[in-house]
Every structure is written in structure tokens, then in C-alpha cells.
Curated annotation (Swiss-Prot):
Keyword Cytoplasm assigned: yes
Biological function: One of several proteins that assist in the late maturation steps of the functional core of the 30S ribosomal subunit. Associates with free 30S ribosomal subunits (but not with 30S subunits that are part of 70S ribosomes or polysomes). Required for efficient processing of 16S rRNA. May interact with the 5'-terminal helix region of 16S rRNA.
One Pfam family linked to the record: RBFA
Domain of life: Bacteria
Main location: cytoplasm
Disulphide bond pairs: none
Subcellular location: Cytoplasm
Gene Ontology biological process: maturation of SSU-rRNA
Keywords: Cytoplasm, Ribosome biogenesis
Cellular-component GO terms for this entry: cytosol
Name listed for the protein in its UniProt record: Ribosome-binding factor A
TM spans (from-to): none
UniProt similarity note: Belongs to the RbfA family.
């Protein structure tokens, strides 16, 4: 019987994902990718999720200071093979070098939406004044 696909990532997947994230971050910080858009944009890599066979690495990135994230994501995906080659030296222990894919990280937007909902007057009214005082103590 095969493993369910929605199971939590293994310790190995998490460890390799963190190593790939650190390697990609170093490549971007050193300016090794020759693309004007990537060079002038500050890019934050929040997470790298590995496939179960460790052959695909999906990097969730947040371009800071840029309104159009899609163009930065597209530029990163255009240079994904080059980045894959550059991180190979840091990941020599891996049998296969993972294919790198870049996706927009929407988790910060989701956090802001949840925070705005929790601070909305409707939710504050439902909580009542007594519950707010208990949380502060």
C-alpha cells in the first residue's frame, strides 16, 4: 500500500529543503544570476518544499519592494537551471540534484487577512470586553 500524498514531510525532506533554501539564498546574495530584475530586487525565500523523492524543490519567494511579483517569479524560473547548477556544489551529498521551481509566497498576505479579520469590529463585538481583559492578564 502506498503512502498518502498529503502526509507531513519527513525529517529528511525538511533537512534537504533547508539546505536547498540556504544554497539558493547564497547564489542570489552573491549576484551570480545575471538578470537586471533579479539583481535589483531583494528576494526573500521563506521555504523550500521537497517532493517525496527529493527530485523537485519548490521555493516559495517574496520579492520585496516590487509590486509585480509575477515578473520576478518568471525571471527566477527562467534561470532555474542555472541556479540548479550553481547550488550543486553545496549539495554534493545528494544522489540527484533537484529541479528548482519558484512560486510566489502568499503566506504573508494570508496572515494579514487573518489579522485584519481578528481585529474587525464584528469579531471584537463577539468576543466582548470580558474576554479581552482576561487575555491581557
Amino acid at each position: 500500500m502506498s503512502k498518502p500524498t498529503n502526509s507531513a514531510p519527513s525529517q529528511r525532506m525538511l533537512r534537504v529543503g533547508e539546505q536547498v533554501r540556504a544554497a539558493i539564498t547564497q547564489v542570489l546574495q552573491r549576484g551570480e544570476v545575471r538578470d537586471d530584475l533579479i539583481e535589483k530586487t531583494v528576494i526573500s525565500i521563506s521555504e523550500v518544499r521537497m517532493s517525496t523523492d527529493l527530485k523537485v524543490a519548490t521555493a516559495y519567494v517574496s520579492p520585496l519592494g516590487v509590486s509585480d511579483h509575477d515578473t520576478v517569479i518568471a525571471a527566477l524560473n527562467r534561470h532555474a537551471k542555472y541556479i540548479r547548477g550553481r547550488i550543486g556544489g553545496q549539495l554534493r551529498q545528494m544522489k540527484y540534484m533537484p529541479e528548482v521551481r519558484f512560486r510566489d509566497d502568499t503566506s504573508f498576505d494570508n496572515y494579514q487577512k487573518i489579522d485584519a479579520l481578528l481585529r474587525s469590529p464584528e469579531v471584537a463585538r463577539d468576543l466582548g470586553p470580558d474576554e479581552d481583559k482576561q487575555e491581557d492578564e
